[in-house]
A protein has these predicted regions:
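N-terminal periplasmic accessory domains that precede
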Residues: 47, 80-83, 100-105, 130-133, ...
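Short acidic/polar hinge/loop motifs at secondary-structure boundaries
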Residues: 113, 121-147
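Face-selective signature of the C-terminal outer-membrane beta-barrel domain
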Residues: 252-273, 292-452, 457-458, 462-481, ...
Length: 578
């Protein structure tokens, strides 16, 4: 399979090395990026101005994309998740308050079907402290939202869309800071500093923190400690063990606008998180002493060079190494009720006894090459490599855990190659065709027992697959645009789905990738009246046919597990008027 892939690349790469005289000159080709800036129209969402910053050709591309200019949100307490919640077609669902899990819904696609990137680099396996609902909106200069088919520049396995966080590398000097206080003793603050010298030396510093007691009221069933039964009715109770705080510090420095590099930036990010765990995946199962702690360190590198060797050939290289340490602590010999009262428990641990320490190591590397031939032909080649390792490092603390799977290796390696061709014959229509090659290697514990008693052994599984698709757009009039796209894509299982979280999320290392056929049809109408008022109407139809759909279920003990469900058929309609 490796030989086949090398042959595949060997046929593709020469296409990008055509002689310079094969490409017509264009005054803007040194700054042209056909895949990553396809951002359409202007929208006003509250105080957020959504603007398309694009080359005219890209504006007429088949990608359905919008952008939020988050510079309007500097010095506010808004986070990236709630900034996205203002975009038509996006819904944000939080499991609780500050520090809780966040799920994105983008035109009917949810969870892992929608991927998040920072500067076109996947955020897979980043520390949970560095999540959309923790990062201040001012951290980004722009949020790009791609719905449906996405450019191969985003080399992940998204089948529902992509959210790309674009950070600020502009040559300017600034200081931004904010602090806010809210309900439930919530404190949020952030600071951003930037300086660029006359010779292109750049320094960027960002830091933020979030804190909350999260002692709001919830309606749930509760445990009667006199007979250890759970009530049939529900009552209102105040959360008493849900304190959360996290901190992050980011430093980036390097050079911009040099003859040998448009960008060469080195970065370092430190994150820390402390979270009390109030309940299991089922709210009726409550805890009073369980908690989770983690910290992470992430060095990174970004290199960009436009007009490499020949005019119109642009190269981008980025890499990041994520090192995270997580502690799941559950040692109290107690059984709690939602009233805050408790009774002694014969065994240690409110759930499963744990002092476990897990170490995760992830290497992410992305190479992107674009080439323009004349004014009508555009090629993009992308290679994305993600190597994840996780192991338990504290053996003595886990003596109470009897599972042999505890100390087995957990490895997930993903290699995705994408190639696209865009044809722009005129201003009325254009089309894009693309192909993706997926190569995955998974190593982890597998339950091989045929009885109720678990028996684990370490197994390895390799899989390869091919994805492909096409998209086109037609502009029959000045105000109307029609977009049609089809994609046969893969959604690879995440590390959490494969290996769990070592606590109340159980993994399944033999999960198969989802295989999906998606069709999207969009109508966009925009008309400006008297150069002062703009009416925008959008109608979107989507169809998806998914095989081996990965579904998350929760058992009676509050433990979640992901399994391949089978066949899922989905159809949707979304409409918006601005």
């Amino acid at each position: 399979m490796i030989k086949k892939k090398l042959l595949f690349l060997g046929m593709i790469v020469p296409m990008f090395l055509l002689p310079a005289n094969a490409a017509a000159q264009h005054p803007h080709d040194g700054h042209y990026r056909p895949d990553t800036t396809a951002l359409s129209r202007t929208q006003h969402l509250g105080e957020v101005v959504v603007r398309g910053k694009y080359v005219d050709r890209v504006n007429r591309s088949a990608y359905n994309a919008v952008a939020i200019d988050t510079r309007k949100l500097r010095n506010t307490n808004l986070d990236l998740a709630h900034a996205l919640d203002r975009v038509a077609g996006i819904k944000i669902r939080e499991e609780g308050s500050v520090g809780s899990a966040v799920q994105l819904n983008l035109n009917g696609f949810t969870g892992q079907h929608v991927k998040v990137f920072i500067d076109s680099m996947p955020m897979d396996n980043s520390n949970t402290s560095f999540g959309l609902n923790n990062i201040p909106a001012g951290f980004a200069s722009q949020l790009q939202v791609y719905k449906g088919v996405v450019p191969v520049t985003f080399g992940g396995d998204a089948i529902g869309g992509v959210i790309n966080i674009v950070t600020d590398h502009s040559p300017r000097t600034y200081v931004d800071a904010s602090y806010s206080y809210g309900s439930f003793n919530t404190h949020r603050s952030n600071i951003a500093l930037g300086w660029t010298g006359k010779r292109g030396f750049l320094v960027r510093f960002n830091a933020y923190q979030n804190y909350s007691d999260n002692d709001y009221k919830v309606k749930t069933q509760w445990t009667d400690l006199t007979n250890s039964t759970i009530s049939n009715e529900e009552g209102w109770f105040r959360r008493f063990h849900d304190r959360y705080h996290n901190e992050a510090v980011m430093l980036q420095t390097g050079l911009i606008n040099k003859s040998w590099a448009n960008k060469l930036l080195f970065g370092l990010r430190y994150t820390h998180e402390y979270a009390q765990v109030q309940n299991a995946n089922l709210m009726k199962i409550v805890f009073g002493g369980k908690l989770r702690k983690n910290w992470g360190l992430s060095p990174s590198l970004l290199y960009e060079k436009r007009n490499l060797f020949t005019r119109g050939l642009n190269l981008s290289l980025s890499a990041r190494y994520d090192y995270t340490v997580t502690n799941n602590i559950d040692t109290l010999s107690r059984t709690y009720s939602w009233t805050g009262q408790w009774i002694p428990k014969a065994s240690q641990g409110e759930g499963a006894t744990s002092l476990a320490e897990f170490t995760g190591k992830t290497l992410t590397a992305v190479a992107n090459l674009t080439y323009r031939i004349g004014d009508k032909h555009f090629f993009t080649l992308n290679e994305t490599y993600i190597n994840f390792h996780r192991h338990t490092t504290d053996n003595s603390a886990n003596r109470a855990m009897t599972s042999a799977a505890t100390f087995m290796r957990r490895i997930n390696i993903k290699n995705i190659t994408g190639l696209s061709y865009q044809f722009i014959p005129n201003n009325e229509w254009n089309a894009i065709a693309f192909v993706k090659y997926y190569d995955t290697h998974v190593t982890g514990p597998v339950n091989v027992s045929e009885t109720t008693r678990a028996q684990y052994e370490e197994q390895q599984r390799n899989s390869q697959a091919l994805g492909y698709g096409a998209a086109g757009t037609w502009t029959p009039g000045h105000d109307l645009q029609v977009k049609l796209s089809y994609e046969h894509a893969m959604r690879l299982p995440t590390e959490r789905e494969l290996f769990g979280d070592g606590d109340y999320e159980e993994g399944d290392a033999v999960l198969k990738p989802e295989k999906s056929n998606n069709v999207n049809l969009n109508f966009n109408y925009e008309h400006t009246f008297a150069d002062a008022h703009t009416l925008v109407a959008e109608l979107g139809l989507n169809y998806r046919n998914i095989q081996d759909y990965i579904i998350r279920t929760i058992n009676a003990k509050g433990v979640a597990v992901s399994t391949n469900h089978g066949h899922v058929l989905g159809q949707g309609v979304d409409a918006a008027v601005h």
